[in-house]
């Protein structure tokens, strides 16, 4: 299983509350349209440093190839465009999960 974590920092003109509403109500439905997506979890920051991330998404795919293929589709391009329309920065991490 392949896992990526995406950290978004909201635009300065968006409150944390407005950013969270956008992510859950508008962005999450777009992400769920990604082909091959196995699981998607959104973690919104309620308390933390202002210079840190405002939200973290965890995405699981069967493989790196499936992840790359999903983001190469029109749905994937729409997800990235929507993210960047609401965030001042976006960082993506490929991670190995250990329990």
Describe these PLM feature segments.
Residues 1-99:
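Macromolecular interaction modules
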């Amino acid at each position: 299983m392949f896992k990526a974590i995406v950290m978004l920092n909201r635009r300065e003109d968006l409150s944390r509350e407005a950013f969270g509403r956008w992510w859950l109500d508008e962005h999450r439905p777009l992400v769920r349209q990604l082909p091959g997506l196995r699981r998607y979890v959104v973690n919104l920051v309620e308390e933390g440093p202002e210079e840190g991330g405002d939200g973290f998404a965890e995405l699981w795919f069967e493989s790196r190839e499936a992840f790359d293929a999903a983001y190469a589709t029109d749905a994937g391009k729409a997800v990235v465009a929507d993210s960047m329309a609401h965030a001042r920065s976006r960082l993506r991490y490929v991670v190995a999960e250990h329990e």
